[in-house]
A protein has these predicted regions:
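Residues in the short beta-alpha loop(s) of Rossmann-like NAD(P)-binding domains
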Residues: 33, 67, 141
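Rossmann-fold dinucleotide-binding core
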Residues: 4, 98-148
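Acidic, glycine-centered active-site loop in nucleotide-sugar glycosyltransferases
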Residues: 42-44, 77-78, 89, 130-134
């Protein structure tokens, strides 16, 4: 199974991350409020102190956060996920609902750093996230879609 970093374990992210654990993936989670990672750690996830630490060695990095500013905080900067040494050609998957301008900037920045980018906002509610029943609105390069 894949090694996955999951950034943002709030209302939606916790359920999504839980489904990945149940599917057998090796999951490392990060949340700015560490307490929110505890239930996932009890299910077998590893909790990380920074997005960079979570993303280290990952095949894919998934984010599910509240807004553009939270997204920028987990992806960019010295401890952001894009500063991590991940698996070669790692996927970045942004599931948050974000502005068009920021999504374009993030995709370009990820590409410049050697990551493949998938834009994947979701629709649904937390109870549906917990059982893997969300609608995904996926945008990606064709080859990246096939790989994902």
């Amino acid at each position: 199974m894949a090694s996955i970093a999951f950034l943002g374990t709030g209302n939606m992210g916790a359920g999504m991350a839980g489904c990945l654990i149940k599917a057998g993936h090796d999951l490392t989670v990060y949340n700015r409020t560490m307490e929110k990672t505890r239930p996932l750690a009890e299910l077998g996830a590893t909790a990380a102190d920074t997005p960079q630490e979570a993303a280290k060695g990952a095949d894919a990095v998934i984010a599910m956060v509240g807004d553009d500013e939270a997204s920028k905080a987990v992806w960019l900067g010295d401890t952001g996920a894009l500063a991590a040494e991940t698996a070669e050609n790692a996927m970045t998957v942004e599931c948050s609902t974000l502005s068009h301008d920021w999504v374009l900037e993030l995709a370009a920045t990820a590409g410049q750093k050697g990551f493949r980018y998938i834009d994947c906002p979701v629709t649904g509610i937390p109870v549906k996230a917990a059982v893997g029943d969300l609608t995904l609105l996926v945008g990606a390069e064709a080859g990246d879609m096939e790989t994902a």
